Amino acid sequence: MKFLAIFLVGLASLFASGASAQEKVGVVLMHGKQGGGPRDGSLESLHRKMQEAGMLVIKPEMPWSFGRYIEGNWGLAMAEIGAHIQKLKETGATRVVLVGHSLGSPAALSYAARHPGAVHALALLAPGHIPYYYSQCIPFSPIRMCGVKDAVERARKEVDAGNADKKQSHTDINQGRASPVWMTARDYLTYFDPASDAEMSVTAPKIAPNVPVLWVIGDRDYLIREGRQYVFDKLPANSKSQYLEVAANHMTAPAVAADQIVNWLKSAALP
């Protein structure tokens, strides 16, 4: 009987490892705000290591790229992510992961919150785009930056005045610098309203409990001052989720943590 029990345990392990071996991890790897294209090398090292690990990777140009900044509303970005996921499945991916750098992080969270069961893990790298803190004039900034807060208030007034779909200049803040962004008031609010799905603290509690999340933040990233409580602690508990601090800034975090990210994905994305 003892031999039979050992045999059955070994057989179960063999079947489990065989099932895992048949799984194929597919990754949608999303750049940050005004990134993407040949000018942006922030994700190249991570991209290469994912491919070397046998993952299927799509690294698309998103609506907030340097060339498209910012095209359409938040819903358009979600639709594009869905299309990329479908392409991964068509090429053999059985487990889908969303990996986002900076603004790619709230996009990944938002898609997973809106589409339970569609993704199996999330990796948020140097998360950025923070409508809640924009609405507070970025309290951890060395100087008060109220440009987005004021622009959101103006955009709301434009919507109320019947000008929701008129394109005009609004304000964005990217790594401490204010910059104009040409959008309709309606579209702008989907990205910058602190109550919108572009705000990570809004979508984090809506993530399915079975979806593990990796949060990677550099020790020289301004957002590290807000710690785990801003978003990570709002996620449903999952034993595979991890909050990882690395010696990096906002732009270098994905490359510095590339090996750790890939190793985490190989474990967390599989059943």
Enumerate the predicted regions with their spans.
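Accessory cap/linker subdomain of secreted extracellular hydrolases
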Residues: L125-T203
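Short beta-strand/loop motif that positions the catalytic acidic residue
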Residues: I207-P209, W215-I217
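Primarily recognizes the serine-hydrolase "nucleophile elbow" in alpha/beta-hydrolase
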Residues: K87, R95-A151
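Conserved alpha/beta-hydrolase "acid-adjacent" motif
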Residues: Y222-R228, A253
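Catalytic active-site module of serine/aspartate enzymes centered on a nucleophile-bearing elbow/loop
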Residues: Q242-P271
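Short, surface-exposed "cap/lid" segments of acyl-processing enzymes
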Residues: E23-A53, E61-W64
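Acidic beta-to-alpha connecting loop that harbors the catalytic carboxylate
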Residues: K33-Q34, G218-Y222, A247-N249
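Alpha/beta-hydrolase active-site loop
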Residues: E71-T91
